[in-house]
Amino acid sequence: MATIAPAPPPTIALDVRRLPRTLPWYVEVWVQMLRRKPLGTVGAAIVLVMLLLAVFADALTPYGFAETNLRERFVSMNGAHWLGTDQIGRDVATRVLYGARISLYVGFGAVAIASLIATLLGIFSAYWGGRVDLLLQRAVDAWMAFPGLLILMSILSLLGPSVLNITLVLGIAAGIRDSRIVRGVALSIRENTYIEGARAMGSGHTRVTLVHILPNVLPTIIVVATTGLSTVILTEASLSFLGLGVPPPYPTWGGMLSLAGLDHMYRAPWLAIWPAVALSLAVFGFNMLGDALRDLLDPRLKGG
């Protein structure tokens, strides 16, 4: 008796190019930036290079940032001093590298403080609403009614210039300002039906805030923090230029521009050129990176 062999199971050809992506959202953001945002990629590259130079400044230069040599005053660019020396023989390249370290330290520290304050104030104000929201927003309005740089100068004049003081002051000022942006996003999220559903199912205020509101506000916080870095770095340079920033002997880009002054501008223009170039590149890099992240993380702009 003949037997019938079972038919082989059908084969299904899968096109791996059409399979859904399983990358984490933050990895997907960087992949999309590489594909669609060339200026954002350039900004990210500038920021990465600046971070590496700041971290490995000790290994990249044989000189100390406060090391002087009066016999080599105003030496122009050469093999020993790639960016020349200043009025007391300090190596300009070394000071620019260490200036990047100070600027990034103040920038990241202030932005971390600002993000925490903005998140707490913005979400708290939006979630509770009513009188709480009214009082907090009127306090923010009163703060923003005064010129920001004037307030910072006044506070630092009382506290004294130091790395810690300028980081705290810049972080608090930026956090109060950015809390309004976070509040606006949190207000729109609070009105969604899933928030009402979570409350109806018995979720407490803490769970609703941490599980349902905070994750949806996080992309906005990332964008605000990235773009805020350029503002913080530029403000720190302005305060250092005025003598209210990080005190000597620590080098800052604003302090180097102040020391160059008109007295040495024509004799040794590199004293002002290289700190200005470094500051401009830092601001450009963080601005381009922040703009690209905003376009990729904001659902209203993802098509741009």
Residue ranges and their predicted role:
Residues 31, 52-63, 124, 179, ...:
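Structural signature of transmembrane alpha-helix termini at the membrane-water interface
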Residues 36-37, 77, 192, 267:
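Structured helix-beta-strand junction loops
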Residues 1-45, 288-304:
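Transmembrane alpha-helical segments of polytopic membrane transport and secretion proteins
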Residues 2-14, 45, 49, 53-88, ...:
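Hydrophobic alpha-helical transmembrane segments of membrane transport/permease proteins
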Residues 27, 45-56, 116, 120, ...:
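Cleavable Sec-type N-terminal signal peptides
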Residues 28-46, 203-220:
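Cytoplasmic juxtamembrane interface segments
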Residues 26-36, 82-85, 93, 210, ...:
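A short amphipathic helical element positioned immediately N-terminal to and/or at the very start
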Residues 87-304:
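Alpha-helical transmembrane segments of integral membrane proteins
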